Amino acid sequence: MPQWSKLLSGRFIHRTICFSVGVALLVTPITASAASSSNGKYQNVQFAAEQSGKANFQGSLLTVGENRFLTRSNIEKEWDGIDPDYKPDQAVKAVKELLSLEDYEALFPNRLGSPAWYEIAKGKEYFKADQKDYFSYSNLIDAVTEVANIKLKISHRKGSPGVQEINRLDKDARIETLVSRSSDFNSAKNKKQEIVTVIIDFGTFLKEGFKKDRKRELAAFLANLAHETGGGWSTAPGGELKWGLFWNENIAGRTGVNTSAFVDEASAALYPGVKDKRYYGRGPIMLSWNFNYGLFSSIIYGDKNVLLKNPEIVSADGKVGFMTAILFWMTPQDPKPSAHDVIINKWKPSKADIAKGLSQPGFGITIMVLNGLEANLGEVEGSSVKRRAGHYRDITKTMGVDITGEKVDTLGMKPF
């Protein structure tokens, strides 16, 4: 699960990445600064209160885009250390012991760029002669490996979850980078407010809990992605579930039916769109809008400009595509927990959650975390939940996991 430095709640760029998987919602982002590539000098960053008559709570002394090398002592004190079980070299084992290459390819035979996809796509508008196996098993493993090298620290002023700064830690290099900061984070008023911090170790993906729960996590992750990228229908050859992971671009955006550049003017100063580049939905979570491309670029590369200048990377490189999905899966967005915490049974519902019917940790609640628009739906014909749950049942069966009694739909649930 995401590792918490305190029993705190955090929001992943409050109002910036509030899209549900597959349904990007335009919400005006906060005014902030974001990282472009920069090398900085070592600075002694303090996260405790300074006493000068009244408490003055100081955040990072780095400027946005600046980085510093950390000693092991710094990492222990400021980042809760680095757990060797969650390092990148454990990623290959983490995936392979849960789902084999053969089973993965049998579950998704028509995935984008597979031999079966080429037969289906031949002569179609979307056919690409050079299409690679985007959702390949190796790309999944590479993504799990690469995200395992990243920790994220989200800090906000107490009572103001939108007043944030975000730091990224490269574990192997022991380099910390300040990737984003609200413009008013260190205002005179806000400096009087305590700093609330959450630390997320992306290396915990597929590596926490009993083996059954780790299998359920991979199944839930792939089931939700398969639904969002599915190309099947009820009478599709081989069955609808064999058509998961078929698409990786929003069709209207790709074909130009929707010509929007998907640049939100309110965030353009922070995450400027590049001329002739369009930020329509790409990848397994259909990453959309300039502010999301810039933010995810900052987390993956430590530089907002990589994906702002080259948004097509998300749909061209399957490893990067899977990385965007894992980052989204692992990160809580107050008041929502992360899907990771839910599926491995680390999330404990609050009284408010229980009142909304959000009381049974399982696949159904991961749907609510990812897309609250699918509340109160059962596994009935025409329901999006039917296909999500169908994929989950199919994958867990392949894994040999018994999910009897697990709530896999959203009946009786309201959004967080």
Question: Which functions belong to the PLM regions below?
Answer:
Residues P2-F12, L26-A223, G230-V263, K336-F416:
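Cell-wall glycan-active module
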Residues T16-T28:
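Bacterial N-terminal signal peptides
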Residues N139-T145, R278, R282-A355:
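Alpha-helical segment that forms one wall of the substrate-binding/catalytic cleft
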Residues G209, L270-G273, K309-I313:
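Short secondary-structure capping micro-motifs at structural edges
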Residues G244-N290:
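Glycine-rich (often Gly-Gly/Gly-Pro-rich) flexible segments and glycine-rich loop motifs
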